[in-house]
From Swiss-Prot:
Protein name, as recorded: Fumarate hydratase class II
Record keywords, A-Z: Cytoplasm, Lyase, Tricarboxylic acid cycle
Name of the gene encoding the protein in the UniProt record: fumC
Annotated site residues (Important for catalytic activity) in this chain: 330
Annotated binding of substrate, by residue: 97-99, 125, 128-131, 138-140, 186, 318, 323-325
Length: 463
């Protein structure tokens, strides 16, 4: 393998010639060959956007040669566009400040910008990773800034659109099935009737609440640490740098980014990310409930509840011919569990800051962005391959309503709780219908039963 010599404050080190990274990235690859998790692509893109904004602002403030700034910006644009995916190989499991990933970006942009200026990589380059690309910055403020940018952009452009689409599908199903009377269930036991549309409307409301809660967290994610530099004081950064870079990032992404009012907090803790992920966890809990309900309602096809049918997408068993499983529901429940686990890790990371810096940053953003991707992709898949194809099995629904003992609840206002309970118990013990049991006990007439026990009237859907 052909190499070139790169140097940092520890001295020279050989770097593969074909790569744009430099000495500090190479050292990180050597010392942190841990597991397979790499820095998430959205974080890399956010860091490149930040470096682009910083170069532009530094040039405007007279802190950086305009030609050098332009080359850095062009190099950063290439990274954002996905041109150099193999240049960011570092493990999540590295320094807790993300310093090595910040330097990975600085080195790649410095070498690429040097090439764009007609120079070369390595010692003879025209752009320096620290003096130029990292001008007015520290890993301690750039990495948390990139964390917030990546988190906000991914939530706004992935999670919320997927949530809205699934919500729309379920709302349409709720409206279409609003007059289908079915038996309700509490404690996994028969309860009073409702309509299938009413039941699904509960799912829609869950998603509405989740969206409201997620949107309420965005203001915190929009506050950026940039300008705090090493410990929050802003040492070596131009006084206008923070506000201008935040405004540039807002313009670049379309998100409402602003400079965080207190940089000490922005470096030392991650409440905004904890709060936001808490809302994602709540969405995960709702999705788990919805997916579980759907697979129970579709259970069967001949020995389960069987009240609804869902799409049959693929064979379900390697031994049982013809078996089809609720695989989309299972995928959603698994990813929801993973998001809940991620929340625990993020909470531990968020609680583990010391003095002026939290050093669990890579852990926090790795888990956050994994949750975002799981939720967004999971909702898109569940919507397309399951929810859109939900159909009622009307005959089965009617059969279960007519067999339910809990219709007896409609008699409470007319004959009282105790007599109604006698009817239900007699019907259950002797395998009678409610009507047969009621007439046998003499608590009401056939006409009264027909007038008082009307499942549709018990749902309030017709009022």
């Amino acid at each position: 393998m052909k190499t070139r010599t790169e140097k940092d404050t520890f001295g020279p080190i050989e770097v593969p010639e074909q790569h744009l990274w430099g000495a500090q990235t190479q050292r990180s690859l050597h010392f942190f060959a841990i597991s397979t998790e790499k820095m998430p692509v959205p974080l890399v893109a956010a860091m490149a956007r930040l470096k682009r904004a910083a170069a532009k602002v530094n040039a405007e403030l007279g802190e950086l040669d305009p030609q050098v700034a332009d080359a850095i910006m062009r190099a950063a644009d290439e990274v954002v566009a996905g041109k150099w995916p193999d240049e960011f190989p570092l493990s999540v499991w590295q320094t807790g400040s993300g310093t090595q990933s910040n330097m990975n970006m600085n080195e790649v942009l410095a070498n690429r910008a040097s090439e764009l200026l007609g120079g070369e990589r390595g010692e003879g380059r025209k752009v320096h990773p620290n003096d130029h690309v990292n001008r007015g910055q520290s890993s301690n403020d750039t990495f948390p800034t990139a964390m917030h940018v990546a988190a906000a952009v991914e939530v706004e452009h992935r999670v919320l659109p997927a949530l809205k689409a699934l919500r729309g599908t379920l709302a349409a199903k709720s409206a279409a099935f609003y007059d289908i009377v079915k038996i309700g269930r509490t404690h996994l036991q028969d309860a009073t009737p409702l309509t299938l549309g009413q039941e699904i409307s509960g799912y829609v409301a869950q998603l509405d609440l989740a969206e409201q809660q997620i949107r309420a967290t965005l203001a915190g994610l929009h506050q950026l640490a940039i300008g705090g530099t090493a410990v929050g004081t802003g040492l070596n950064a131009h006084p206008q740098f923070s506000a201008k870079v935040s405004a540039e990032l807002a313009h670049d992404t379309g998100s409402a980014f602003v400079s965080a009012p207190n940089k000490f907090q922005a470096l030392a803790s991650h409440e905004a990310l904890l709060f936001a992920h808490g809302a994602l966890k709540t969405l995960a809990a709702g999705l788990m409930k919805i997916a579980n309900d759907v697979r129970w309602l579709a259970s069967g096809p001949r020995s389960g509840l069987g009240e609804i049918s869902i799409p049959e997408n693929e064979p379900g068993s390697s031994i049982m011919p013809g078996k089809v499983n609720p695989t989309q529901c299972e995928a959603v429940t698994m990813l929801a569990a993973q998001v809940m686990g991620n929340d625990v890790a993020i909470n531990v990371g968020g609680a583990s800051g010391n003095f002026e810096l939290n050093v669990f940053k890579p852990l926090v953003i790795h888990n956050f962005l994994q949750s975002v991707r799981l939720l967004a992709d999971g909702m898109v898949s569940f919507d397309k391959h399951c929810a859109a194809g939900i159909e009622p099995n009307r005959e089965r629904i009617t059969e279960l309503v007519e067999r339910s003992l809990m219709l007896v609840t409609a008699l409470n206002p007319h004959i009282g709780y105790d007599k109604a309970a006698q009817i239900a118990k007699k019907a259950h013990k002797e395998n009678l219908s409610l009507k047969e049991a009621a007439l046998a006990l003499g608590h009401l007439t056939e006409a009264q039963f027909a007038e008082w026990v009307v499942p549709g009237d018990m749902t309030n859907a017709r009022r």
